[in-house]
From Swiss-Prot:
<keyword id="KW-0687">Ribonucleoprotein</keyword>
<protein>
    <recommendedName>
        <fullName>Large ribosomal subunit protein bL27</fullName>
    </recommendedName>
</protein>
<dbReference type="GO" id="GO:0022625">
    <property type="term" value="C:cytosolic large ribosomal subunit"/>
</dbReference>
<dbReference type="InterPro" id="IPR018261">
    <property type="entry name" value="Ribosomal_bL27_CS"/>
</dbReference>
<comment type="similarity">
    <text>Belongs to the bacterial ribosomal protein bL27 family.</text>
</comment>
<feature type="region of interest" description="Disordered">
    <location>
        <begin position="1"/>
        <end position="20"/>
    </location>
</feature>
<dbReference type="GO" id="GO:0006412">
    <property type="term" value="P:translation"/>
</dbReference>
<dbReference type="Pfam" id="PF01016">
    <property type="entry name" value="Ribosomal_L27"/>
</dbReference>
<keyword id="KW-0689">Ribosomal protein</keyword>
<dbReference type="GO" id="GO:0003735">
    <property type="term" value="F:structural constituent of ribosome"/>
</dbReference>
<dbReference type="InterPro" id="IPR001684">
    <property type="entry name" value="Ribosomal_bL27"/>
</dbReference>
Amino acid sequence: MAHKKSGGASRNGRDSNPKYLGVKRFEGQIVDAGNILVRQRGTKIYPGINVGLGRDFTLYALKPGIVKFSIKHGKKYVNVLPIQ
């Protein structure tokens, strides 16, 4: 009788935790200062008027207002326009 031990366990079976990236406040929504607008990896969207850029490229509102997205020179920007 052959005595061959069974093979090792599967090499798969790992997964990373979800990062919950993406746009969090959409165009036309009213935001307060400090609200997170976009979570991203790198600058897919750039900060515009009244928008700050965090250490992990998170875009957040610097002042209360209305969210507005725009494209300039092929780059996407997010702005927070003050409420009149």
